[in-house]
Amino acid sequence: GKRLRGILIVFCLLISNLGSSFPQDKSAPGAVQVHLVITAEAQREDSELPALRQDDVKVKQGKTFLQVTQLIPARGDTAALQLFILIDDTLDSHVGNNLNDIREFISAQPPATLIGIGYMSNAGVNIVQNFTPDHALAAKALRLPRGNTSTMDSPYLSLISLVKGWPQQNVRREVLMVTDGIDRLRGEKPTASQLGPSFGPVYHSMPTMSPDVNSASEISQRYNVIVHSVYAIGVGRAARSSWDLQIGLSGLSKLADETGGECFSLGTSNAVSFKPYLERLQKIFESQYFLVFLATPGKKPGLQRVRISTELANVEIAAPDNVWVSAGK
């Protein structure tokens, strides 16, 4: 909202020269530039990750390879990162044991990282700390989740409300969600239309993946937001249902995979410590690049499916499944 936009004004000035790191290339006739963030990942944890060069990255649309014009490491002058930490207010209070792990993670962030903190409930976000470079201030904003349900608990609708109110800039924009991924609003007790006509007049409470997972994924990809998650169990009957728990985890995994993020979990169990997850997330931040390539626009702006890969040995690239391409002129 207005508070979120206001806190970013000073930061906008600080990073306004970032655009100079993306000089305009001479585009092929009709082609448009697409900017996004990708992550280089080692296939084996014990192996060294080489630095990517521009010609190491391949972007493919259908059977056509698209021209990569720039690959810029997200370090130094281009290290700016806006990281919003979203905590589900339906989480069990036992997650409080892990809050210190998150505080230490926040405090260890480099100066170029802005941190925001919010709690998810009622299909929205209660922002307790707007984006700030003061990491100690952000760490202090963390509190125990309330540990109860509201009338509209959907982590995916909460994410959508955050992303839609997030001013766009040429910096990394990432979210860390701490949640069980269960849509207690529309996923736990599906409507007849979700179940399908074959179920007949008798109601079945079989949970389904939230219909808002796809919407959250598409909106995040539309606005270049990478979504990571740490799985933690909430309260209520849904949190005692193995089916609900598994579907919630599947929704988080799908969302992370499609936006180029990572879903951290120990199956559907609570982790003793978040520290290994957060250390892995830090490695992700340190292995990111700004990628610029030329895409063929359609008659209307929209998401286009692309595949981003590398032929380097033992290296994988995590990237969004789709990119937003503006309309042709």
Residue ranges and their predicted role:
Residues 6-17:
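Bacterial N-terminal signal peptides
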Residues 22-329:
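Scaffold/interface architecture of coatomer-like assemblies
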Residues 1-4:
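N-terminal secretory signal peptides that target proteins for export/translocation
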